[in-house]
Design a protein with these regions (language model features):
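Selective transmembrane helix interface/packing segments
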Residues: 1-261
């Protein structure tokens, strides 16, 4: 088996975590991730401006109709989970979904080079971590606004066990809160990072296996790569949906009365 794989190992040159880097204020910056994130943000903003210019109270166009369906789906999820108090969560969850999905689409671009010019920003742990921390901060802000400062702290010491076991309650609830940003980050980062590796490995495998078949080999290589990219794009959409859904559920926990948990 090792001898069979030796030719493939010789042509594969995948370097996970390699980026176009530079220094800024003494900090190491992954510039490819920075500009990919900026481009994704510009795409989302541009889509919003286009939608705003084409919005009408009459018969909606296809673009506006798709947007209204997306908003309606998120609104229903928020209403079912949080109720009317969660109206402000709708734009946050929808924006996160669209932005993450746009970032994830970049993973299907530029496969085959040592350093992709436009990598998926979500395949670098810094962006998922930043978004996860932002979500958690906003969730705690909503909890304080909903329960008040006293109720916010009481929530962590008064349940799930009686108040006399407050230290145990604080420990368990503290662990739960620490785990939330970790799971949000690693779920998104891990899937996109692994997906990028699989795309690179598949491209190398197909090139090695069918590289000597001329035009037929080129066609087969393209077909395999396109099919896997479509599959990976579907995974990217699912991960964006999960991130947005968990955001809604975290707000639900923060904004619900204590007796509901």
């Amino acid at each position: 088996m090792a001898g069979f794989m030796t030719p493939l190992v010789g042509i594969v040159n995948i370097q996970p975590g390699e980026h176009l880097q530079g220094k800024l204020f003494g900090l190491t910056i992954n510039w490819d991730i920075v500009w990919a994130t900026c481009i994704a943000g510009l795409i989302v903003i541009t889509l919003g401006l286009i939608l705003r210019s084409k919005a009408t109270s009459g018969v909606p166009g296809k673009f506006q109709l798709a947007w209204e369906l997306a908003v309606g789906a998120v609104q229903k999820q928020v209403d079912d989970s949080i109720g009317p108090r969660g109206a402000a969560v709708v734009p946050l969850a929808l924006t996160l979904f669209i932005f993450i999905f746009t970032c994830n689409l970049f993973e299907a671009l530029g496969i085959g080079s040592e350093l992709d010019f436009l990598p998926a920003p979500t395949s670098d742990i810094n962006l998922p971590l930043a978004m996860a921390l932002y979500v958690i901060v906003m969730v705690h802000r909503a909890a304080i606004k909903n329960r008040g400062v006293k109720g916010y702290f009481r929530h962590y010491v008064a349940q799930p066990f009686p108040m006399k076991l407050a230290p145990a309650n604080l420990f368990m609830n503290g662990i739960e809160e620490l785990v939330k940003p970790v799971t949000l980050t690693l779920r998104l980062f891990g899937n996109l990072f692994a997906g990028g590796l699989m795309l690179s490995l598949l491209a190398a495998l197909v090139a090695w296996r069918f590289g000597n078949y001329g035009v037929i080999g080129g066609v087969l290589s393209s077909v395999f790569t396109v099919v896997w990219k479509l599959f990976d794009m579907a995974i990217g959409a699912i991960q964006a949906f999960i991130f947005a859904l968990l955001t809604i559920l975290y707000f639900d926990t923060a904004m619900a009365p204590d007796e509901a948990h």
